[in-house]
Amino acid sequence: MYKIAFDVMGSDLGSLTAIKAASEFIKEHNDLYLILVGDETEIKTALEQNPIDKNKYEILPTTQVIDMNGSILDIRRKKDASIIRTLELVRDQKVDGMLTAGNSAAFIGAAHFILGELNNIVRAGFMPTMPNAKNKLTLLLDVGANSENTPEDLINYAKMANIYYTEVLKNPNATVGLLNIGTEKSKGLELQKQTFKQLEKLKNINFVGNVESRDVLTGNVDIIVTDGYSGNICLKACEGAAKVLLTEIKKEITSSFIRKLAALVLKKSFKNVAAKFDYKNHAGAILLGVKGICFKSHGSSDVRSFKATLRMTLDAIKNNIVEKIEKGLIKNEY
């Protein structure tokens, strides 16, 4: 039985949405047990509307929340915050992994102090899985865990993501690119130039050079490494572009009776494309580099987003990804 700690507090839509997602997800997975962390009264009220088998969950009651307006200093001030208690369950090995949609800065800071980083990892990075045109997934990191990074950080991201792609996504021949403003070797700031030189030297990394942001969704590169500031801008630009494009397509095909008839013929194709590039189906990001399986979902997560993050968390647990990353970094096998 796999155990996941779910911080149900702190998201924009509240605990009811998180509990509804948990209720639906656990019915699809007989090998899963959840620890629901948060305000006990809220959780019990939500469970009345979205029941879960009593043998498949327990509640860890907390009295505090670090919401989106909170500060990283709250990780010291609010010892009984749900996000703190959830991470402590991972540290104490009472669960196999955790997820939250709470305050990102508090999550990153608390993970650093409570769990710590793997050997030789200075800064953990957020890594989502992004859909692409080749019906595969692209890994992009860091997408916002850090505002500044060093070449050593990006090298470690490439190594860890390569292990993740091999073990979780089952592709041992992943290509790795460096996000930059051009494909030429000389492009970029000193960070990109130094990182490029070091990536070229790695024998176990299939480095293909610089990648521009317009190529992120093409699927031509499996793993794209970048600093957290640039990565966050890139991620949100991709999500926003996909959302606007799908909205505009829907608007156009429903603007007249003739177009609506034509759309009926292509309905399945439109649905497939919409599902592929809907970020809610890929809403989670693992905090790669800490001593535990820790996922962050969007603060605006709805039921579908939470279920996607639960699925990603469970996949990482089943593939024992943190232990494999730790061993891979030590042995330099990937």
Swiss-Prot record:
GO molecular function: phosphate:acyl-[acyl carrier protein] acyltransferase activity
Enzyme class: transferase
Enzyme Commission number(s) of this protein: 2.3.1.274
Pfam entry (one): FA_synthesis
The protein's annotated pathway: Lipid metabolism; phospholipid metabolism
A GO BP entry: phospholipid biosynthetic process
InterPro entries linked: FA_synthesis, Phospholipid_synth_PlsX-like
Cell location: Cytoplasm
Coiled-coil zones: none
GO cellular component: cytoplasm
Location, primary (coarse class): cytoplasm
Keywords, ordered alphabetically: Cytoplasm, Lipid biosynthesis, Lipid metabolism, Phospholipid biosynthesis, Phospholipid metabolism, Transferase
Family the UniProt entry places it in: Belongs to the PlsX family.
PANTHER family membership: FATTY ACID/PHOSPHOLIPID SYNTHESIS PROTEIN PLSX, PHOSPHATE ACYLTRANSFERASE
Function, in words: Catalyzes the reversible formation of acyl-phosphate (acyl-PO(4)) from acyl-[acyl-carrier-protein] (acyl-ACP). This enzyme utilizes acyl-ACP as fatty acyl donor, but not acyl-CoA.
SUBUNIT field: Homodimer. Probably interacts with PlsY.
Protein name as it appears in the record: Phosphate acyltransferase
Naturally occurring in which organism (per UniProt): Mycoplasma capricolum subsp. capricolum (strain California kid / ATCC 27343 / NCTC 10154)
Gene: plsX
